[in-house]
């Protein structure tokens, strides 16, 4: 299994419960698709470098996990169709 790192930004107008639900849902997607060792680091609400979808701020979440390529692809697919996620970046960590 490879190590992946996903940094994603959640809409700032969501309440804390909705943010937590989104984080839990994405962690569950990883574990349901063969991923393991999910680590979540919440960076909190920060200002974006530029306006994205009319938002100037967002909740930054860093998620690290081990999994196959299909696991990372499924997480990206879910984030693309999610209304809560404004932006995301997935990188494969070097060994």
Swiss-Prot record:
InterPro entries: Ribosomal_bS6, Ribosomal_bS6_sf, Ribosomal_S6_plastid/chlpt, Transl_elong_EF1B/ribsomal_bS6. One of its GO terms (cellular component) is ribonucleoprotein complex. The keyword Ribonucleoprotein applies. Keywords: Ribonucleoprotein, Ribosomal protein, RNA-binding, rRNA-binding. PANTHER family: MITOCHONDRIAL 28S RIBOSOMAL PROTEIN S6, SMALL RIBOSOMAL SUBUNIT PROTEIN BS6M. Belongs to the bacterial ribosomal protein bS6 family. This is Small ribosomal subunit protein bS6. It comes from Desulfitobacterium hafniense (strain Y51).
């Amino acid at each position: 299994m490879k190590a992946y790192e996903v940094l994603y930004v959640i809409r700032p107008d969501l309440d804390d419960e909705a943010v937590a639900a989104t984080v839990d849902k994405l962690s569950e997607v990883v574990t349901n698709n063969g991923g393991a060792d999910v680590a979540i680091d919440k960076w909190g609400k920060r200002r974006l470098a530029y306006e994205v979808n009319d938002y100037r701020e967002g909740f930054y979440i860093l998620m690290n996990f081990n999994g196959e390529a299909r696991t990372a692809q499924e997480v990206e697919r879910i984030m693309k169709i999610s209304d809560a996620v404004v932006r995301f970046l997935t990188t494969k960590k070097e060994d």
